C-alpha cells in the first residue's frame, strides 16, 4: 500500500456544456437528443444540433425583440400573444415563415378596405366660393 490516496491522480476538468462551448442559451444536448429520437435520420452529426440550436435561438430573439417593441407601443410591460401576432404579421420575412401558423389569442391585424372608407369631399369653405 502506498498510502497516497487520490493525491497523485490527474485532476479532471470541470464539465462544460455544449451550449456554453458554442456560446448559446438554447440546449444543444436536448436538441441533439430530439434529433436522434425524432427519426429524421439514422445518424446525427456533432455540428447539426449546435447549428440548429443557434438558428432556434436567433429566431426566438428576433420574434421577442419585435414583440417587445409592439408591447412598448401599446404602453404595456408584459408581452402577450397579441404582441407576438402583431410582431410576426408586420414583419415580411417572419410572416412568410409563419404564414400558416395560428397564434392562440392573437387576434387579427387591423385593416379596413379602402373601398369602405368614407369618400373625401370638398370642405364647406370650398363649396361656398
UniProtKB/Swiss-Prot annotation:
The modification N5-methylglutamine is found at residue 105. SMART domains: H2A (SM00414). Keywords: Acetylation, Chromosome, DNA-binding, Isopeptide bond, Methylation, Nucleosome core, Nucleus, Phosphoprotein, Ubl conjugation. The modification N-acetylserine is found at residue 2. The modification N6-acetyllysine is found at residue 6. One of its GO terms (molecular function) is protein heterodimerization activity. It is found in: Nucleus; Chromosome. Residues 1-22 are annotated as: Disordered. GO terms for biological process: heterochromatin formation. There is a cross-link at residues 14, 16, 120 (Glycyl lysine isopeptide (Lys-Gly) (interchain with G-Cter in ubiquitin)). The nucleosome is a histone octamer containing two molecules each of H2A, H2B, H3 and H4 assembled in one H3-H4 heterotetramer and two H2A-H2B heterodimers. The octamer wraps approximately 147 bp of DNA. This is Histone H2A.J. It comes from Gallus gallus.
Amino acid at each position: 500500500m502506498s498510502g497516497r490516496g487520490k493525491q497523485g491522480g490527474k485532476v479532471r476538468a470541470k464539465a462544460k456544456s455544449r451550449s456554453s462551448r458554442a456560446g448559446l442559451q438554447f440546449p444543444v444536448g436536448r436538441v441533439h437528443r430530439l434529433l436522434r429520437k425524432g427519426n429524421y435520420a439514422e445518424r446525427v452529426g456533432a455540428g447539426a444540433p449546435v447549428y440548429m440550436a443557434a438558428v432556434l435561438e436567433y429566431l426566438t430573439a428576433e420574434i421577442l425583440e419585435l414583440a417587445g417593441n409592439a408591447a412598448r407601443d401599446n404602453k404595456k410591460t408584459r408581452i402577450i400573444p397579441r404582441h407576438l401576432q402583431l410582431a410576426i404579421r408586420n414583419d415580411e420575412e417572419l410572416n412568410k415563415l409563419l404564414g400558416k401558423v395560428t397564434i392562440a389569442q392573437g387576434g387579427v391585424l387591423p385593416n379596413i378596405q379602402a373601398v369602405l372608407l368614407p369618400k373625401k369631399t370638398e370642405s364647406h369653405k370650398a363649396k361656398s366660393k
